[in-house]
Amino acid sequence: MPIRHLPNRHMYSASSQSTGEFAHPSADSTPTGRPTAYPVDVVVSLRREGTARLLRTLRSHQVLPALLHPWGSGAAYRSLLREPDSLSLLDVPEGAVTDDLAQRVHVLSALSSVVVLTPGHIDSVDLLRAGAANVLPRDMPPPELAGRLTAERRWLGTSTPSRDRRVRALPQQVLRPRQLSQGILLDVLLSSARPWCCHDLCLLLGTARAPMSRRALQARMLRLGERLTPYGLSVTSTVQWGRTTYTGISG
């Protein structure tokens, strides 16, 4: 499957580190709060040091948001789920673990459209088949990369119907979990248009180096179920051939 060739255009800005690399957001924003200067809503990194260097390289262009997030960041997933047609950038620097890269693209594409930045030695075909909107080389000249990301946002906005991934509202009396990890798990289940296999959820909620263990996922699901039970709600799931599939929240 060929990679689309998109026109060049300029724009961006960055600087320090906590959950990521800071940039200077635009004063203008959409009704949902996304800065209009940034084509990309969230940057997710499989190796933070390499992505931080990329942000500094792109300092003079307005294409990336304020923070760099490591894989598994609840804050990143929450931001993506708040936007009806979000765009994430999955950066794969040299030295990142790439054995399960296609599967990572697959699970992240359930939350947003995904553009992947890769080193030259990674084949793009499997990533496109896994659901990537586009795959771009990391060594592309900064002005060209900025233009491609800007054009990607424009192309997604005009070529396909909006895929609404926003979180469905809970009944008013239900108190949301205070823990970010529990809240994100709840939001993923509430926003999903398809069932989630336990292996996919473990990968989504793990780190860049390793998925979450199935035992840890089961414990988290149990705690979430206990919070929902007083409101007459439950996590629905099926088990077949040793694999648990979570189908959402019911009640």
Q: Each predicted region: which residue ranges?
A:
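Conserved acidic segment of CheY-like receiver
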Residues: 36-73, 88-92, 115
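Receiver (REC) domain switch/output surface
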Residues: 135, 144-159
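Short amphipathic alpha-helical recognition elements used for nucleic-acid or partner binding
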Residues: 175-208, 224
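DNA-binding patch around the recognition helix
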Residues: 159-180, 218-251
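Conserved phosphotransfer microenvironments
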Residues: 51-52, 72-112, 116-124
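Alpha4 helix (beta4-alpha4-beta5 surface) of REC/receiver domains from two-component response regulators
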Residues: 120-134
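Non-catalytic signal-transmission and effector/linker regions of two-component phosphorelay proteins
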Residues: 1-57
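A Lys-centered signature of the CheY-like receiver
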Residues: 138
